[in-house]
C-alpha cells in the first residue's frame, strides 16, 4: 500500500507529507496492521519483543502512539519534548534528498511541551515499551540546561520505560556543547541523583539513555563513555543526524542547513557505533540508528555492536514493510 501512496506524498512539501502520513495511519483498515514476532531482546532491565523500534522525531507529542503501535514496532520513542512548548525553526525546515534516500531537517525541537505529551500518553491504549526523548528549550542557556532536563525527567518518569537525553541535535544552538566535559558530567550527576529519588517515589527504575552525535572526535566519544560508565547510564543511542554533507555533495537541497539522516548517514553512524562498542563493551546497551533501510544495513548495525535498532528515514522511503522485512530476516539468521 505504501508503494502506491509514496509518489503522491513525495509531491507534497516534506513536512506536510509527514503530517498527512501520521493522520492517515489512524484510518488504515485493521487488516493492514499486524503483530510481528521476533527474537526477544533483554536489555536495560526490559524485554523487547524484537530488535526494531521507532526513533524519536516522528511523533514528538505522542499524538499518534496507538496508530504507530499497530505497525509492529518493538518499542516506540516519542519526542524530543521540552519543558515548554516551542514552535521550532521557521519553515521550510524539512527536505528530502530522494536521490540518496536521505532527509535534512532543522526542525529545532518543535513540540507542544512535556505536559501535553504526558496527557497524550495517559490517554493512549499503548502498553508496550515506550521511550521518551527529552531536551532543553531554545532560550535556556547552557548553565541552566540541566534544570530543563530534570523538569522533563520528573514529568515523564512514571510514563516511560526509558528516558533519552538528547544533547546531540544540531538544530538547537550550542546544544552539542552539553556533550563536552564538565557540562556532560554535571548533567549526568544531577540526572542520576534525580533518578534515585524518582525510583524510590514510584517504586520502579527507569533507565537513562544518552543520544550521541556522529560528528564528535574519537577522543570526545571516549571521554563521554568514561563519564557514562562512571554514572551508570544504561544505554547509548548511536547516532543523531550529521552536519556533514560529504555524502550528498552537489545533490538538490544538500546545502540546506540542518541534520542529515538516511542512507548517507549509515557509514558514519556505524563507525561511531563500532567505536562505542570498543569503549563500553557489554556494560551499556547500544541502540543503532542512522541509515537503516534494509536487512543488510540492520545486520551491519548489529555486527557493529547494536543490541537494538531504530528506524525513521528508512520508513519514509521504504514504508512500514521495512519493519517486517528486517525482523523476519533477522529471525532467519
Swiss-Prot record:
Protein name per its UniProtKB record: Dihydroorotate dehydrogenase (quinone)
Catalytic activity: (S)-dihydroorotate + a quinone = orotate + a quinol
Major location (coarse): membrane
Keywords associated with the record: Cell membrane, Flavoprotein, FMN, Membrane, Oxidoreductase, Pyrimidine biosynthesis
Similarity comment: Belongs to the dihydroorotate dehydrogenase family. Type 2 subfamily.
A molecular-function term among this protein's GO annotations: dihydroorotate dehydrogenase (quinone) activity
Gene Ontology annotations of biological process type: 'de novo' pyrimidine nucleobase biosynthetic process; 'de novo' UMP biosynthetic process
Location in the cell: Cell membrane
Cofactor: FMN
Pathway(s) per entry: Pyrimidine metabolism; UMP biosynthesis via de novo pathway; orotate from (S)-dihydroorotate (quinone route): step 1/1
Binding site for FMN: 56-60, 80, 133, 166, 211, 239, 262, 291, 312-313
Enzyme class: oxidoreductase
Top-level taxon in the UniProt lineage: Bacteria
InterPro entries: Aldolase_TIM, DHO_dehydrogenase, Dihydroorotate_DH_1_2, Dihydroorotate_DH_2, Dihydroorotate_DH_cat, Dihydroorotate_DH_CS
EC numbers: 1.3.5.2
Its biological purpose: Catalyzes the conversion of dihydroorotate to orotate with quinone as electron acceptor.
PANTHER family: DIHYDROOROTATE DEHYDROGENASE (QUINONE), MITOCHONDRIAL, DIHYDROOROTATE DEHYDROGENASE (QUINONE), MITOCHONDRIAL-RELATED
UniProt key word Cell membrane: yes
Active site residues of this protein: 169
Amino acid at each position: 500500500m505504501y508503494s502506491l501512496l509514496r509518489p503522491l506524498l513525495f509531491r507534497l512539501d516534506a513536512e506536510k507529507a509527514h503530517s498527512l502520513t501520521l493522520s492517515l495511519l489512524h484510518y488504515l483498515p485493521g487488516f493492514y496492521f499486524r503483530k510481528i514476532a521476533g527474537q526477544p531482546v533483554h536489555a536495560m532491565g526490559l524485554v523487547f519483543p524484537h530488535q526494531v523500534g521507532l526513533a524519536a522525531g516522528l511523533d514528538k507529542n505522542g499524538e499518534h502512539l496507538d496508530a504507530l503501535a499497530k505497525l509492529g514496532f518493538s518499542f516506540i520513542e516519542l519526542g524530543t519534548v521540552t519543558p515548554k512548548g516551542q514552535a521550532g525553526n521557521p519553515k521550510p525546515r524539512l527536505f528530502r534528498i530522494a536521490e540518496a534516500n536521505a532527509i535534512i531537517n532543522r526542525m529545532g525541537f518543535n513540540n507542544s511541551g512535556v505536559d501535553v505529551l504526558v496527557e497524550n500518553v495517559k490517554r493512549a491504549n499503548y502498553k508496550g515499551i515506550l521511550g521518551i526523548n527529552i531536551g532543553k528549550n531554545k532560550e535556556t542557556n547552557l548553565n541552566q540546561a540541566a534544570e530543563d532536563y530534570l523538569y522533563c525527567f520528573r514529568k515523564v518518569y512514571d510514563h516511560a520505560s526509558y528516558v533519552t537525553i538528547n544533547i546531540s541535535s544540531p538544530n538547537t544552538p550550542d546544544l552539542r556543547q552539553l556533550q563536552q566535559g564538565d557540562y556532560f558530567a554535571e548533567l549526568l550527576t544531577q540526572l542520576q541523583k534525580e533518578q534515585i529519588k524518582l525510583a524510590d517515589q514510584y517504586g520502579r527504575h527507569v533507565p537513562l539513555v544518552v543520544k550521541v552525535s556522529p560528528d564528535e572526535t574519537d577522543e570526545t566519544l571516549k571521554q563521554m563513555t568514561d563519564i557514562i560508565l562512571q554514572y551508570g547510564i544504561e544505554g547509548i543511542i548511536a547516532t543523531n543526524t550529521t552536519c556533514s554533507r560529504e555524502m550528498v555533495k552537489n545533490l538538490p537541497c544538500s546545502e540546506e542547513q540542518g541534520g542529515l539522516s538516511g542512507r548517507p548517514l549509515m557509514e558514519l553512524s556505524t563507525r561511531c557505533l563500532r567505536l562505542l562498542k570498543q569503549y563500553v563493551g557489554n556494560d551499556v546497551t547500544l541502540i543503532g540508528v542512522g541509515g537503516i533501510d534494509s536487512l543488510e544495513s540492520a545486520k551491519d548495525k548489529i555486527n557493529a555492536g547494536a543490541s537494538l535498532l531504530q528506524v525513521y528515514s528508512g520508513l519514509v522511503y521504504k514504508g512500514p514493510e521495512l519493519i517486517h522485512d528486517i525482523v523476519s530476516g533477522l529471525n532467519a539468521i
